[in-house]
C-alpha cells in the first residue's frame, strides 16, 4: 500500500482496502468480514479519497466528499488524539501555523475539518498550506500503517 501511494496508485490502494472496509461484494471481490484491522481499513479508505481531492472518483463523488463519507463510517479512532497532538506540533514550524490550527478543533481531532482545510489549500492555491496538509497527512499515514502492522502482526 505504501508503495502504491508513493507512485500515485490511488485506484490500486483503494482496491486493497475496499474488501476490508465495505460489507458488500464489489469488483475487487467479496468482503472480508471480521478483519482485526477493519476500522483501520476504513480510515485508510477515507484517506485514499482525501488524496483524490477535487477529482471525481468512485460513485460520482469528489474525493473530499467521499473522504468525509468514509471518515463518518470510521467514526472515532483511538489514533485521533495522537494525530491532533502531532498536527499541532507540525503547525509550529509554519509561519501561518496558528491560522491553520484555527480551522481544526482544539478539543478533538476531526478528520472532516482537516479534509476541508486540504480542500481550501487547493482551492486557494496556497502552497504553504498545501505543504502543511501534506506533512500532516504523511504523519497520519505513518501512524496508521504502524497501527495496522501492530494489529495484523499480533494476530496468531
Q: What are the functions of these language-model segments?
A:
Residues 1-132, 136-144, 153-156:
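Non-catalytic amphipathic alpha-helical adaptor/oligomerization segments
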Amino acid at each position: 500500500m505504501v508503495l502504491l501511494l508513493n507512485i500515485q496508485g490511488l485506484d490500486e490502494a483503494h482496491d486493497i482496502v475496499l474488501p476490508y472496509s465495505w460489507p458488500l461484494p464489489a469488483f475487487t471481490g467479496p468482503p472480508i468480514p471480521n478483519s482485526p484491522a477493519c476500522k483501520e481499513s476504513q480510515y485508510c479508505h477515507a484517506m485514499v479519497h482525501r488524496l483524490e481531492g477535487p477529482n471525481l472518483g468512485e460513485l460520482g463523488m469528489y474525493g473530499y466528499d467521499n473522504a468525509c463519507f468514509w471518515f463518518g463510517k470510521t467514526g472515532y479512532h483511538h489514533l485521533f488524539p495522537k494525530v491532533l497532538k502531532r498536527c499541532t506540533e507540525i503547525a509550529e514550524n509554519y509561519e501561518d501555523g496558528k491560522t491553520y490550527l484555527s480551522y481544526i478543533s482544539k478539543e478533538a481531532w476531526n478528520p472532516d475539518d482537516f479534509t476541508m482545510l486540504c480542500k481550501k489549500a487547493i482551492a486557494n492555491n496556497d502552497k504553504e498550506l498545501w505543504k502543511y496538509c501534506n506533512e500532516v497527512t504523511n504523519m497520519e499515514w505513518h501512524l496508521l500503517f504502524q497501527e495496522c502492522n501492530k494489529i495484523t502482526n499480533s494476530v496468531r
